[in-house]
């Protein structure tokens, strides 16, 4: 054990194990998660060479092999609980992504949410066992987040009771679905449903694309890999072109909308019911943002405790770089953010399951807010985590640029989440639509509930945005509850400003659509403020549920740091709204620095509580034992370029040197 890390752990003010239990949900869940981790880490079938030193084709082959092993092992170990399946899947490929991932994260959830009982009986068991390997083909070359623009068609033929699928243009070719290129044999395809000469919009169809047994593409199917990407080397993101490809009528997912044998269309009870899969995945992505940022913080903070550099006082030993205030200022707000997102991710998961149960009983009342909240928080957390991971990499100096740090892999595998499952700016604008509807409800004298209930407090007589400067508040910068109130006022103010500016543009432009576009910057800012408020609120409320006094104290410091750092970065919003005064902002900036000092002695223990095993981090710099330099040298020796003393390419240089 590196002596610096031992000293850091010995000086912690709390027991990291107890905090791990809180993050997992209970001591029993921690025990079971570790049990599953050890099943994998101690199983020779799951061992493989360092993927960093393999070609893309080799990495893909390793990933497919391990995915097949994963399914067999889950059967062998009797793992069926959804949480346990998730833990197992995360660990079997460690820091990398899997070609069959969309089978479990999109294909099966969509089948569960939108399939009839008969459809689930037909496909569910086979897809869980990978006899059917599914993907989710929504995005096209020409359209992504704008779903109504998708061009793929599914035209019903009543004579044969089949749908005929076509990709009528080059831009209609399905593009990007993970596992589509070489792995999947089925896809849930989103296509424009046409029956009796009328288009009824997007619907989901289960489409066989490869022959089971030979894995060759079926007639009418052109399918392949889209080529190298920024990351995701282990996944065969693919393209799919369909030419008069026929599927049975029963392959349309018909839990809600239906097409009768004669071609009659039966519309769903509510169009919102088809949001199910998107809402599920977006709520899941909030937790993924927390996990990715937590990993990056673990690596950067441990390394900063091991790394000694420069001088604070001339002539004294080189200090740990974690002792520099600038390093603390880079990393500790991100650590606080990681904890905030952990708690928000758990809240979103619980909320999704609760509301989904209500939907199953016909209660759709909370679905609009859930849709808005998952869209906004997906964007807010992924943008923040994405920036934070890169900040952690740069905080590790030159070594952070090496793949041995693990940080480049974390970054390239996380950054797609800013654009997949809804491009983030568009997600923020979806949240803004809900905020504007809620504002209009309040303005018309109705009350709103849920996370937007703060809009009920808006005085109805206030018309001009500049008149917002009448908030009756005195913010206590040492009170999480008071800071939550400040964020609430900021959100209300920015929602109202966006609403008033939108109203002005509607009056001036006569077109709601043009007005919306010309107000979209204000609308995104309103959504960001709303999401920021939600995160602060949930973090603050979590403190009240913590029993252990030492853990509550350190989490309170993190909550204050998260909230105050956010104010310091958005001081203009709090000043313009007269939510806070200039002297208070000065106090905020000073308090942030005090909190850095307070958190310093617990920083390593706080990342230890995330409980990432070394193999999960995949980082030489973030090793639990802190023995960075010895292992850095050993890692470099394994580079394929070092297999021969003289590389074969020397022949190109030799002729130039023969003249010397």
Curated annotation (Swiss-Prot):
Its cofactor is FAD. One of its GO terms (molecular function) is PDZ domain binding. Changing residue 184 to L: In pseudo-NALD. The modification N6-acetyllysine is found at residues 216, 255, 267, 272, 437, 446, 500, 504, 512, 637, 651. One of its GO terms (biological process) is unsaturated fatty acid biosynthetic process. It holds the Pfam family ACOX_C_alpha1. Homodimer. Interacts with LONP2. It is linked to Adrenoleukodystrophy, pseudoneonatal: A peroxisomal single-enzyme disorder of fatty acid beta-oxidation, resulting in clinical manifestations that remind neonatal adrenoleukodystrophy. Clinical features include intellectual disability, leukodystrophy, seizures, mild hepatomegaly, hearing deficit. Pseudo-NALD is characterized by increased plasma levels of very-long chain fatty acids, due to decreased or absent peroxisome acyl-CoA oxidase activity. Peroxisomes are intact and functioning. This is Peroxisomal acyl-coenzyme A oxidase 1.
